[in-house]
């Protein structure tokens, strides 16, 4: 082994060998359970101690799980067995299970996985328990669990050894069960609205659909450079061109960027597209869907996050980005007429910008540096500048802006959406402008995608599209402060 075994580990290895010597498989086979601990409690906890005595003949059960506590000496003892649904107490007596199985019980360690068959009863303190008639060792644990009273105190160890976190931390287990339910309800909502779930490539020849730095890989057989996708967008819009009018995909996206409490190099997104819709329709859909998910998973659309009550039930605020900046700073970007004027205002208000930035970039910097973190309750910010929205349709009344929105809750972006740009000539011009930005040092600027332009030339109907970061949504709905708390296996720097 790569590490020296401590005394407890050595004792467990010795017990392992003793089991082999007795002809007992310490890594047993299938065990048929009658239910989870929660099922037993739901069915039997309603009865009194006396009623359970009367019903003993009908209360035969079989449970399995991990030994989390163990106490008792002599010819009887108690333990708590933990399964996915929680814990239930077992009571093991020598005269009930026999000498051989009682020896198994006596030598069992915390962390061992056991199977118990028996009948239901209540102790003198009223705790629902299983009186063992048969005790089986299913898996011998060769390492001791973390201290039962303190669990995993090292937050980094919780992330690196998630299996230990799940064993010892009920809140973590509940978070990941709710994550699964959130994604399930998202699918239910969209499927009921007539959307079709699809799968598109994760390796792209061109990194597109978002402003981000990609991971690069190489296909040896084809001698081709490929990029792990930074967005799902462009393939889904090709499907809209092809006549699949309402599509969505839930999948992994990869961005070669920093790691923080809000960012992981690989994360989960949903993107959806609806033909003959615009960003107003998508705004309505987003609000309705998130509210539905909260109600179905949590039982309420008023959720707690970091001590704050977030009201997903009431109508969400809708605010133009220019109005949001004006409310926060007094600067009215509707009246700003040139890049130079915007740069002067940035300097006046202490906004950090790059020399190459234009009007739209500077407006966005005002928003990100002065407004974004103040948006605690659900707020749709719409009307983003054209310069930072290369795939969104221009607003017909003021072409400086696009028909785009982002959703902010607890000071974080949770969704990005727009009326899709379906004019291939305009789209090509936007890509060309992005290439200029890339040449000026913007690593996140969009590449030219001639194949996508060709698809648009066949005609894409008016379309509304949406992207939601599922990890951030799960953070919100589970009151989790870090993205690592909602990823089973987050990226960790090598030790």
UniProtKB/Swiss-Prot annotation:
HAMAP family: Lys_tRNA_synth_class2
Cofactor binding remark: Binds 3 Mg(2+) ions per subunit.
Alphabetical list of InterPro entries matching this protein: Aa-tRNA-synt_II, aa-tRNA-synth_II, aa-tRNA-synth_II/BPL/LPL, Lys-tRNA-ligase_II, Lys-tRNA-ligase_II_bac/euk, Lys-tRNA-ligase_II_N, Lys-tRNA-synth_II_C, NA-bd_OB-fold
Keyword Magnesium annotated: yes
Subcellular localization: Cytoplasm
Primary gene name: lysS
Gene3D superfamilies on file: Bira Bifunctional Protein, Domain 2, Nucleic acid-binding proteins
GO cellular component entries: cytoplasm; cytosol
Residues engaged in binding Mg(2+) 2: 413
Cofactor dependency: Mg(2+)
Catalyzed reactions: tRNA(Lys) + L-lysine + ATP = L-lysyl-tRNA(Lys) + AMP + diphosphate
Protein's name according to its UniProt entry: Lysine--tRNA ligase
Binding site for Mg(2+) 1: 406, 413
Record family assignment: Belongs to the class-II aminoacyl-tRNA synthetase family.
EC identifiers of the protein: 6.1.1.6
Alphabetical UniProt keywords: Aminoacyl-tRNA synthetase, ATP-binding, Cytoplasm, Ligase, Magnesium, Metal-binding, Nucleotide-binding, Protein biosynthesis
PROSITE patterns: AA_TRNA_LIGASE_II (PS50862)
GO biological process: lysyl-tRNA aminoacylation
NCBIfam families: lysS_bact, PRK00484.1
Keyword Ribosomal protein: no
Taxonomy, superkingdom: Bacteria
């Amino acid at each position: 082994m790569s590490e020296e075994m401590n005394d407890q580990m050595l004792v467990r290895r010795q017990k392992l060998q003793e089991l082999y010597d007795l002809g007992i498989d310490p890594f047993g086979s299938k065990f048929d359970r009658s239910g989870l601990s929660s099922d037993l409690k739901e069915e039997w906890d309603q009865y009194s101690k006396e009623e359970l005595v009367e019903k003993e003949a009908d209360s035969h059960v079989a449970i399995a799980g991990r030994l989390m506590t163990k106490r008792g000496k002599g010819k009887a003892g108690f333990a708590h067995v933990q399964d996915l649904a929680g814990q239930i107490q077992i009571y093991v007596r020598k005269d009930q299970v026999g000498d051989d199985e009682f020896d198994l019980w006596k030598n069992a360690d915390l962390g061992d996985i056991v199977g118990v068959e028996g009948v239901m009863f209540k102790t003198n303190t009223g705790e629902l328990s299983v009186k063992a008639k048969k005790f089986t060792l299913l898996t011998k644990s060769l390492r001791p669990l973390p201290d039962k009273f303190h669990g995993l105190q090292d937050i980094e160890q919780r992330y690196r050894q998630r299996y230990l976190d799940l064993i010892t931390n009920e809140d973590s287990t509940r978070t990941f069960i709710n994550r699964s339910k959130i994604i399930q309800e998202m699918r239910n909502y969209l499927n009921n609205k007539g959307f079709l779930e699809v799968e598109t490539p994760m390796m792209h020849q061109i990194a597109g659909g978002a402003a981000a730095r990609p991971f690069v890989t190489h296909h040896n057989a084809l001698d081709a450079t490929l990029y792990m996708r930074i967005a799902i967008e462009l393939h889904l819009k090709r499907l809209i061109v092809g006549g699949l009018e309402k599509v969505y995909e839930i999948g992994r996206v990869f961005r070669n960027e920093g790691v923080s409490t809000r960012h992981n190099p690989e994360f989960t997104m949903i993107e959806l597209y609806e033909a003959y819709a615009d960003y107003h329709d998508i705004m309505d859909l987003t609000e309705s869907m998130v509210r539905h998910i909260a109600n179905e998973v949590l039982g309420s659309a008023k959720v707690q996050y970091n001590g704050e009550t977030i009201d997903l039930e009431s109508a969400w605020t809708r605010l133009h980005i220019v109005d949001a900046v004006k409310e926060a700073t007094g600067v009215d970007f509707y009246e700003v007429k040139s890049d130079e004027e915007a740069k002067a205002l940035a300097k006046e208000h202490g906004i950090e910008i790059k020399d190459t930035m234009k009007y739209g970039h500077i407006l966005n910097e005002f928003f990100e540096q002065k407004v974004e973190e103040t948006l605690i309750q659900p707020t749709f910010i719409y009307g983003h500048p054209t310069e930072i929205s290369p795939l969104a349709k221009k607003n017909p009344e003021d072409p400086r802006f696009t028909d785009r929105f982002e959703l902010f809750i607890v000071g974080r972006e949770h969704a990005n959406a727009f009326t899709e740009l379906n004019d291939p000539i305009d789209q090509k011009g936007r890509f060309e402008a992005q290439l200029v930005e890339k040449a000026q040092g913007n690593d996140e600027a969009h590449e030219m995608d001639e194949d996508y332009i060709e698809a648009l030339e066949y005609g894409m109907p008016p379309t509304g599209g949406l992207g939601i970061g599922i990890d951030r949504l799960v953070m919100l709905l589970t009151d989790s402060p870090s993205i690592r708390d909602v990823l089973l296996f987050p990226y960790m720097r090598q030790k």
